[in-house]
């Protein structure tokens, strides 16, 4: 893999005791381009703005997907990436639904591990937080025709982050607006899913709430998921969570909680 390193790191300017989520970035980015037939080689270069043609299809039709996962330092100062394989698998499921090319799981796994190894000094201690990884793919054809792009770019950028929430949340039960519908793209981490949620989320925040608990599109009586997480509740000593279907994201943390709960006999 070709790696172009920055001439001067930004590491020394970061206050790891004050990490605002998603606003502080590491020195480099991982890139791989799809030319319409096959993926090129992964490479790493210094983080910088990307240039795009105004007719790039992603700007008009939203053919874009992403993932989110974290790397941590353990007690031995070794780096652990939480369930990277599962995130790559889910990314490819999103790609299929959005008519985008799948990534080679093994090559992608190795490339992301090399990228994280390069940026390991940006990983906070476990008391401070973690390194948030944002893999994403965008369509890059230059056309205003409403068709699937043939060319795509896959990238990974990273942010040292603190803890996303520092207090319990006030949750608003949303029964007017809907996040997703059966047969749609709710199970995919498609960029537009999140843009569509901003307006009702802001309405909830104006009422003093932190997050929305979304309900089903049919009658608003079936609980689905939160804006930034899957939903669990405990009743009569048992742990419950909505069944996964195509309007609910297949949460990797959700799956981890279920495995742990079963292991503990819950």
Specify the residue positions occupied by each region the protein language model found.
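Helix-start/capping segments and mature chain N-termini
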Residues: 1-115, 136, 143-266
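Extended, Lys/Arg-enriched charged tracts that mediate electrostatic binding to polyanionic substrates
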Residues: 124-134, 138
């Amino acid at each position: 893999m070709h790696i172009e390193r920055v001439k001067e790191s930004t590491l020394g300017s970061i206050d790891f005791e004050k990490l605002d989520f998603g606003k502080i970035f590491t020195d480099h980015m991982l890139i791989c381009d799809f030319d319409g037939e096959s993926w090129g080689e992964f490479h790493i270069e210094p983080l910088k703005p990307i240039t795009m043609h105004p007719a790039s299809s992603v700007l008009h039709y939203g053919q874009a997907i992403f993932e989110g996962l974290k790397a941590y330092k353990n007690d031995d100062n070794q780096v652990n990436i939480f369930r990277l394989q599962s995130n790559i698998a889910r990314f490819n499921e999103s790609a299929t639904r959005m008519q985008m090319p799948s990534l080679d799981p093994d090559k992608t796994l190795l490339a992301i591990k090399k990228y994280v190894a390069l940026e390991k000094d940006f990983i906070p201690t476990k008391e401070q937080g973690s390194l948030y990884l944002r893999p994403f793919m965008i369509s890059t054809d230059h056309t205003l025709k409403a068709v699937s792009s043939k060319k795509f770019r896959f990238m990974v950028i990273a942010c040292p982050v603190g803890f996303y929430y520092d207090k319990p949340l006030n949750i608003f039960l949303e029964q007017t607006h809907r996040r997703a519908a059966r047969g749609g793209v709710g199970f995919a981490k498609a960029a537009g899913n999140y843009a569509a949620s901003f307006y009702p989320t802001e309405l909830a925040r104006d009422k003093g709430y932190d997050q929305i608990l979304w309900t089903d599109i049919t009658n608003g009586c079936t609980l689905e998921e939160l804006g930034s997480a899957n939903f669990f509740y405990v009743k009569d000593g048992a742990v419950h969570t909505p069944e996964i279907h195509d309007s609910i994201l297949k949460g990797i943390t959700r799956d981890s909680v279920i495995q742990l709960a079963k292991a503990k006999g819950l």
